[in-house]
Amino acid sequence: MLLPLKVLGQVKLQDVTISGKQPKFVRLKGYYRSYQHNDSLLKYYVDGIVEYYINLKNEKVYLRIYGCRYLRNEELISKDKKRAFMLSDQATFRPWPEGTTFIEECRKKYTIQDSANVGYIKKKGQNIGRITTDSIRKCCTIEMDMVPTYDKLSQNIFGFSQEIVSDKFTEAYRLSDEDYYSFKNLIFQKTDQSYNYWHKKDSHKQLIHVVTELFITEQEYVDEKKKESGINLQPQEATQAIENYMSVHGLPLLPPEEQAEMKKLQFYDPAKL
């Protein structure tokens, strides 16, 4: 996957020279969006400006939110069949960087066969991903097919079933002089998952497709996290803040067809559901 040059050019990194005392946190600030289609119709959309503090010692993550929007298609939701026991079909989520980067996890779990600017990720001899280095864009990208890593592709609970169709994961990092990539190098993350979803009494399986993207715009080492909480904005205020943030940092908009579908969605408060 190629990242927009504009995005890569807007990444603001504040590396520091460390002597003696080690920093306590990596601070990441950026924008995320997560949206879900049911049978090709946009049903849920969430996005926001987020700031993460990752503790370098115990790997705990602290989150501050500067503005977040929750939207859904009320017409589609009104058509959902009512069951005695209901499970929400919403699968959008907020990215949560913790532990080690995905590329480091792959180095621990799988074999990586290096070849020029491309490293192939293998599980039991099968190619399941690749790591690509781009010296022009000065980034390293890992792309992974997650399906071969699953023990099983389907699960059932309370009469509802889910069957994985595809699951792709991408992370991109700024090129580093080090021989590994930490969160201080992270600039982009994406998951793209599709699965069939149905109730045992349904005659039709819904195809659910969820895409979640995280664009990192600021990174730095810090000795302490901010004590104040995030900013809780009303929907219209959050919309203005997000649009301004995306414009300032040159972040890519959704494709025109997705933007048109968003006009059919309504704001909602998840705390009141």
Where are these regions (language model features)?
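Surface-exposed, low-complexity/disordered segments
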Residues: 11-273
